[in-house]
Amino acid sequence: AVRSCVAAYRDEVAFLADQPLLMRSYNRLDVDRLHETATEKSLRAEIHRAARRARHRTSDRALPRFTRELHGRRQIVEEPPLITHLMRSEQDAVAEALDDYLGTLASHWRRVVGGYTIVDIAHKVVGVGSVGLRAYVVLLEGSSPDDVLFLQLKQARRSVLAPYVHGESAWHAHQGQRVVEYQQALQTVSDPLLGWTTVGDLQYYVRQFRNMKGTIPLDAIDAAALTDYAGVVGHLLAKGHARTSGASMIAGYFGKSDNLEQAMCRFASAYANQTEVDHAAFVTAVRAGRLPIEPGALESSGSAFRP
């Protein structure tokens, strides 16, 4: 899978390095082409299912799942500790921050979003990659009760790579702006409502909470499909990197040999071995009582912690 990913990345970067900058920006891989690119039947089936699920991930579809009507007014449903409402002072701070967010949008979208009114705000715990960071979800209503929009504010901090690129100086004064601008640079089509704002002394980027985003569950595909999938990932990553105008430099670094592919395969193998060692140490610590866990967590997860 690693070799497939790196080889696809190398080939696509080499191709795009010879293309005009504008063509690189327009070059895209839509669902139909992605389906054609996949050689494994099982992966093509998962792509089809992921696309179908993504088309249903919209604000209006989320309305009955995440809200309820109380005294004639829509409210976000609490699911403690994952979704909780805010104190009035924090609600006011988020609402004020959304006013500032409007100024980061293109004029057309500023008018569109400005036509919506805030109905409810809640704090929402998000994925593993954002553990320890704050995130809000905001329900807004437009011209009718069925005309709804969910926005998500996610805290943004300075990249862990920044010290190695910019030293102690910050290339962007606002880290939410950094996330938005880099996402727009890497993606052919980004969320048009991407923007940034500040709540208190914390910086955030803002996006649609439900914007037809989809993913392929890796535990649903076999080894052959995983290898195929890794090649698609490498292909797409190359497109994103090429849009930043660095394709020629990257292609030159790869050269004509497979030395980099071999090096990354060795690294991946070593990393996999280390992961198994780390996991074994983690399991030992849990079983010995040195690390606390939530009661019942292991029984419901099909975990390797079970004896």
Predicted regions and their residues:
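Conserved ATP-binding subdomain of kinase catalytic cores across diverse folds
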Residues: 1-59, 96-307
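Ordered core of a single globular domain
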Residues: 68-117
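Acidic/Ser/Thr-rich, low-complexity mid-to-C-terminal regulatory regions of eukaryotic proteins
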Residues: 46-83
